[in-house]
Swiss-Prot record:
The chain crosses the membrane at residues 37-57, 63-83, 98-118, 123-143. May be involved in fusion of retrograde transport vesicles derived from an endocytic compartment with the Golgi complex. The modification Phosphoserine is found at residue 9. It comes from the Eukaryota. Belongs to the SFT2 family. InterPro entries: Vesicle_transpt_Got1/SFT2, Vesicle_transpt_SFT2. It holds the Pfam family Got1. This is Vesicle transport protein SFT2A. Residues 1-36, 84-97, 144-159 are cytoplasmic. It is found in: Membrane.
């Protein structure tokens, strides 16, 4: 129906870019997007909690780092279903979120490196904590004035 509307209004498919054509062809309904958002978000919470539970097992730091990182990636991917992957990536790298995004992604990678390759448990835990803090700071950027409120709260506690 959309193609018919474009043809009738004088717009050709050739005017539409390749990316727009691909996104048009693979777009999901709102209900489907909402369902997959919930599935990914719940999976992210589940993996994060599972990873936290595995932390207390002998040699569980590796599993903790993997599952905690997998949980954060699933939670991050869940928002791609709500706003679309291209829009999500554009928003992630806006100037207001750029630093938080870079730190978050680096912490995701360094958590896995510390746990799996470097075999440094303390470093893996440190990167998981930094991963949590950077993910929280990144998430707060979507709520108007939330970062300012957190900064004021922290500064009043520290002074």
């Amino acid at each position: 129906m959309e193609k018919l509307r474009r043809v009738l209004s004088g717009q050709d498919d050739e005017e539409q870019g390749l990316t727009a054509q691909v996104l048009d062809a693979s777009s999901l309904s709102f209900n489907t997007r909402l369902k997959w958002f919930v599935i990914c978000f719940v999976a992210g919470i589940f993996f994060s909690i599972l990873g936290t539970g595995l932390l207390w097992l002998p040699n569980g730091v590796k599993l903790f780092a993997v599952f905690y990182t997998l949980g954060n990636l699933a939670a991050l991917a869940s928002t791609c279903f709500l706003m679309g992957p291209v829009k999500q990536l554009k928003k992630m790298f806006e100037t207001t979120r750029l630093l938080a995004t870079i730190i978050m992604l680096l912490c995701l990678v360094f958590t896995l490196c510390a746990a799996l390759w470097w075999r440094k448990k303390g470093l893996a835990l440190l990167f998981c904590i930094l991963q949590f803090l950077s993910m929280t700071w990144y998430s707060l950027s979507y709520i108007p004035y939330a970062r300012d409120a957190v900064l004021k709260c922290c500064s009043s506690i520290l002074s």
